[in-house]
């Protein structure tokens, strides 16, 4: 089955992918990442949260994980960066912030999703993106969704 995972480039999503991907080894998996949630400027408390959830992982931790032997996992390493996870999925891991625009939607269509798992994805899917996968979209989100 072709499974497309839509997720955010943050700590919780990286952890979720580390748990999901091994269980999906029998499937064709493509992962698209959003760079952030929402498009409005962040209030100061949310900027601090962004540092903990995104900047710390992507700017400090992941480069250290990826620096050894071309990013290959170290012996005994249990959690992997987005870049290391990309080596474990056939469809790759890439950024897709504009899934509802023509070019972004075309990239999404190319993943030929039978099922979409949306885990903390930072973009609200419009009807064409929602109706594309024949088995639907399963949305896993850690908080209330906007109206």
In which residue ranges do the predicted regions lie?
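One-carbon transfer enzymes
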Residues: 1-147
